[in-house]
């Protein structure tokens, strides 16, 4: 068995009496409030040969790499993972800004990630969607990390680190009850994500101030929102705007990926909740699939307008020039066809092939 490590941030309530070494995280908000964030890393044991076999599995019409089966396998492994939250020492009754001697978990994790990036590795923040338990979230995030590093264009000397943000979605397959509950919890969790973005902004600003003219490491932080994760992003942008002076949001990410986005298909138009997402990134990619049954269910059984993740933007000409769309319908296979961001290296390859390229670069493959 081989050990695998994953970084995480969460506003879930921990399971067990030891908050720094919990048994896991549940489907309720932290007792310290929905915007309270715990940062940490977990280590799980898994069969390296089984992982390699799943990553090498050939898929019909979509290259190789069965990410969904890999996520299922790692979900089982996650139930016995060792969890180490970064310890904190600070008062809850006043702002951490007023506590110069406070010990913050976010600062400790950011420092560790900075060390990873200095070894020529990018970081990808992953926000999951609806109906996802703690083990499910860990399995998906770690599968994504392994798939990215196994992709054809992956540099063996550059290791992508996925940072999971997991929020208390129900993890219950009760379509009407769970979806409505998760939608409410996603809104509150979006503000927690925004708080996390503010912490990243402040950390990067502090690094810049202390750099003394030294060149940055040259690596990027990216963001991938799956399904209802894009709904969280709407509220994260609102919180970021509320605490950002000036007229522009801070540019935090190299690339933002909106995969199977469970938001309205006009969400990126001027005046809509995601209209300013281009301000926080160099590029924004919308991945959609016309055969995504989860999007159909969201449209018709939940009474939602047409979803962005099904047919893409309603009026493409109204999108900012940094936003582009990828129709995954021809290469996605399966019954539900919703978690295709994990489904084969064909899609993973597409993500890596456009990373860092300008919108008009001829190397971009549509």
What are these regions (language model features)?
Residues 1-94, 138, 155-219, 237-366:
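Lipolytic serine-hydrolase domain surface
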Residues 9, 126-127, 224, 287:
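Short hydrophobic segments within beta-strands
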Residues 87-120:
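Acidic, polar low-complexity linker/tail segments
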Residues 114-168:
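Short, surface-exposed "cap/lid" segments of acyl-processing enzymes
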Residues 127-135, 179, 183, 223:
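Short, charged/polar micro-motifs that form catalytic or ligand-binding hotspots
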Residues 193, 225, 229, 233:
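Gly/Ala-rich beta-loop-alpha elbow adjacent to hydrolase catalytic centers
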Residues 222, 226-227, 257:
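Residue in the alpha/beta-hydrolase core beta-strand immediately N-terminal to the catalytic nucleophile
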């Amino acid at each position: 068995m081989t050990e695998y490590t994953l970084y995480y941030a969460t506003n879930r309530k921990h399971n067990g009496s030891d908050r720094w070494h919990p048994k896991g995280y549940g489907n309720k908000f932290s007792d310290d409030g929905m915007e309270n964030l715990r940062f940490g890393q977990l280590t799980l044991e898994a069969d390296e040969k089984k992982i390699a076999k799943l990553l090498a599995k050939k898929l019909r019409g979509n290259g190789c790499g069965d990410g969904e089966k890999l996520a299922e396998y790692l979900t089982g492994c996650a139930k016995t993972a060792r969890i180490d939250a970064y310890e904190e020492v600070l008062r809850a009754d006043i702002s951490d800004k007023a506590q110069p001697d406070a010990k913050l978990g976010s600062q400790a994790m950011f420092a560790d990630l900075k060390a990873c990036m200095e070894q020529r590795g990018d970081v990808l923040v992953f926000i999951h969607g609806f109906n996802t338990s703690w083990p499910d979230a860990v399995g998906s995030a770690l599968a994504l990390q392994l798939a990215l590093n196994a992709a054809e264009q992956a540099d063996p000397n550059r290791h992508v680190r996925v940072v999971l943000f997991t929020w208390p979605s129900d993890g219950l397959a009760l379509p009407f009850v769970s979806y409505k509950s998760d939608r409410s919890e996603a809104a509150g969790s979006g503000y927690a994500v925004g708080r996390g973005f503010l912490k990243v902004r402040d950390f990067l600003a502090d690094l810049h101030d202390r750099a003394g003219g030294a060149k940055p490491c040259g690596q990027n932080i990216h963001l991938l929102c799956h399904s209802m994760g894009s709904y969280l992003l709407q509220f994260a942008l609102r919180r970021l705007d509320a605490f950002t002076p000036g007229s522009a949001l801070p540019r935090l990410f190299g690339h933002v990926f909106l995969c199977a986005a469970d938001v309205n298909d006009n969400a990126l138009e001027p005046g809509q909740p995601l209209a300013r997402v281009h301000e926080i990134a160099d590029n924004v990619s919308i991945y959609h699939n016309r055969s995504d049954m989860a999007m159909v269910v969201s449209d018709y059984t939940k009474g939602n307008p047409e979803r962005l993740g099904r047919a893409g933007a309603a009026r493409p000409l109204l999108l900012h020039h940094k936003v582009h769309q990828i129709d995954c319908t021809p290469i996605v296979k399966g019954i539900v066809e919703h978690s295709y961001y994990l489904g084969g290296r064909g899609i993973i390859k597409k993500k890596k092939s456009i990373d860092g390229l300008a919108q008009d670069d001829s190397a971009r493959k549509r």
